[in-house]
A protein has these predicted regions:
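Membrane-helix and juxtamembrane interface regions of eukaryotic multi-pass membrane proteins
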Residues: 1-85, 91-108
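Alpha-helical transmembrane segments
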Residues: 7-14, 140-149
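Transmembrane alpha-helical segments that form the membrane-embedded catalytic/substrate-channel core
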Residues: 17-27, 84-93, 116-123, 147-158
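Juxtamembrane helix-entry segments on the extracytoplasmic side of multipass membrane proteins
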Residues: 71-73, 134-144
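Small-residue-rich segments of transmembrane alpha-helices in multi-pass membrane proteins
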Residues: 106-116
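Membrane-interface helix termini and inter-helical loops of multi-pass transporters
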Residues: 126-135
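Conserved small/polar residues in nucleotide/adenosyl-binding loops
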Residues: 159-164
Length: 169
């Protein structure tokens, strides 16, 4: 068993355990937040803390492997970083969050999740996969790319709309 497969197995077991645990305990986040989960930080800074590892770690993977990677892997990593730059920095700055906080335990557990998630994806993209240039013309690529840009378009609409109701009038 390779290291990557071992990490995948362990992470799958962690995911299954958390899935089962959350049937019995509601995660203290957002509208379900409760006191008693420890020290709290600003929701805006908590969001940046928990999402930014995805951007930075993929950037490190890209820098370390740029010269010996396929064009497809580089393109996929860049799309990933565009998404996580928006998710890590743009959204928290633009979000209508005032005087809200989150438990540090939630931010740190999401930080850990994002760190392991990017380790798995970056290892796949830059060390295991063997994507040929022909992947750029495949149906799954066009479907995924279309979905990516449709989601980006919807986010842009939501960012520029004063109210979500304005989109449906």
């Amino acid at each position: 068993m390779t290291t990557h497969q071992l990490v995948m197995l362990i992470w799958s077991l962690v995911g299954l355990s958390v899935f089962i645990y959350l049937f019995f305990q509601t995660a203290p986040y957002g509208r379900h937040q409760e006191k008693g989960w420890g020290f709290e930080i600003s929701s805006r800074w908590g969001w940046i803390l928990m999402e930014s590892p995805a951007f930075y770690l993929m950037l490190i993977f890209l820098i370390l492997n740029f010269s010996n990677s396929s064009h497809f892997s580089i393109f996929a990593a860049i799309l990933f970083m565009i998404h996580y730059f928006n998710r890590s920095f743009i959204w928290p700055i633009r979000a209508r969050i005032k005087n809200k906080s989150m438990p540090v335990t939630i931010a740190l557990s999401a930080f850990l999740f994002n760190f392991v998630n990017v380790y798995i994806q970056g290892t796949w993209l830059f060390y295991i996969s063997d994507y040929a240039t022909s992947h750029f013309s495949s149906v799954p690529f066009f479907l995924g790319l279309s979905l990516f840009f449709i989601g980006m378009f919807i986010n842009c609409l939501l960012y520029t709309s004063p109210s979500p109701r304005d989109l449906w009038i």
